[in-house]
């Protein structure tokens, strides 16, 4: 976690000693084109862009699909063509490098344009794709779409200038799949000054708050241990903020308990701040996580935190000092910590 000036200094280190070293540039006055994928991560890349501007780096932040599309997509008219918008964007901004946060046609077009490409990797892509094959993508059409998307992702990973995983655990994973690729951890800090207590939303106490998505079964399935936890702790209320393709599957199992409440999606950061202000304990119940921002945010709000000891979580917190780690699948351990 950083205060604003600390965060800016960290990004200065990142630019000077990693990106500029790879680009073989001695002057920090470079032009970086930043492309975001999901709207949920726009806020953080905007902060990144603003911090770099303070250092003299000229940046432009765009949505990747506004400028670069192709097969597979839901709109057949996007399957063919030269992505003229992308070409015009490059000609207009003339970047020294491109920074993306998902593997997409924007990355492929950057590689074809022979512009240095840096990929911010937040998730365990290879585990996600395997779980998608097992759980979501069983029909021939969807399997074909998944094959093409994986082909795009692997081409991005293989031909990028560098891949920037958000923790050391994930860097090791990248090296397993692409041992010759340049990597360095991108510690995605957050501005500590944004996370302060406000008047919270109305919740029943005592309560445990969960703030996590449900788009990947390998990660989401761990939430099912809450059935045993809520049964043993009927007087503790559990509030889940999150959404995703497995939302209904989780709710179907957990709504059987009167002490479970699903709050859906909350506006970020204002409503999330209200939620974190009110809860008594923050819990991250996950089958795989790397360096989740919500865990950092809860810690900044001075909330007791409990998290599954998986992925890169142990890099973020020290057991029994800055929070409690519980082993995956161990509902008794989670009950005891609560």
Task: Annotate each language-model stretch with its function.
Residues 287:
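Aromatic "clamp/platform" in nucleotide-sugar-dependent glycosyltransferases that forms part
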Residues 154-197, 205-207, 211-213:
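Donor nucleotide-sugar binding/catalytic pocket of nucleotide-sugar-dependent glycosyltransferases
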Residues 304-307:
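Short hydrophobic beta-strand element within catalytic cores of glycosyltransferases
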Residues 67-72, 119-151:
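Acceptor-binding helix/loop patch of EC 2.4 sugar-transfer enzymes
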Residues 248-266:
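Nucleotide-activated donor-binding/catalytic signature segment of Leloir-type glycosyltransferases, i.e.
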């Amino acid at each position: 976690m950083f205060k604003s000036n600390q965060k800016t200094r960290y990004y200065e280190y990142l630019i000077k000693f990693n990106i500029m070293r790879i680009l073989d540039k001695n002057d920090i006055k470079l032009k970086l084109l930043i492309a975001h994928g999901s709207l949920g991560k726009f806020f953080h890349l905007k902060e990144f862009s603003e911090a770099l501007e303070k250092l003299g780096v000229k940046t432009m932040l765009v949505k990747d699909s506004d400028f670069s599309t192709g097969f597979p997509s839901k709109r057949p008219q996007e399957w063919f063509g030269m992505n003229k918008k992308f070409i015009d964007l490059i000609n207009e901004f003339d970047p020294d490098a491109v920074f993306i946060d998902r593997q997409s046609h924007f990355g492929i077009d950057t590689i074809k344009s022979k512009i240095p490409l840096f990929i911010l990797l937040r998730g365990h892509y290879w585990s996600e794709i395997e779980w998608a094959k097992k759980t979501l993508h069983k029909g021939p059409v969807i399997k074909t779409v998944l094959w093409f998307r994986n082909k795009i992702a692997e081409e991005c990973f293989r031909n990028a200038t560098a891949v920037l995983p958000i923790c050391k655990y994930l860097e090791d994973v990248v090296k397993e799949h692409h041992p010759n690729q340049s990597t360095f951890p991108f510690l995605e800090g957050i501005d500590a000054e944004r996370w302060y207590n406000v008047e919270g939303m109305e919740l029943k106490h005592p309560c445990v708050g969960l703030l996590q998505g449900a788009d990947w079964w390998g990660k989401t399935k761990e939430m099912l241990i809450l059935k045993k936890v809520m049964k043993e702790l009927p007087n503790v209320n559990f509030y889940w903020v999150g959404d995703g393709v497995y939302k209904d599957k989780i709710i179907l199992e957990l709504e059987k308990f009167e002490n479970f409440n699903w709050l859906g999606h909350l506006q970020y950061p204002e409503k999330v701040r209200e939620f974190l202000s009110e809860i008594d304990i923050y819990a991250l119940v996950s089958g795989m996580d790397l360096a989740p921002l919500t865990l950092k945010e809860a810690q900044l709000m001075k909330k007791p935190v409990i998290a599954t000891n998986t992925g890169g979580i142990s890099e973020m917190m020290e057991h029994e000092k800055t929070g409690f780690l519980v082993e995956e699948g161990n509902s008794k351990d989670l009950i005891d910590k609560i």
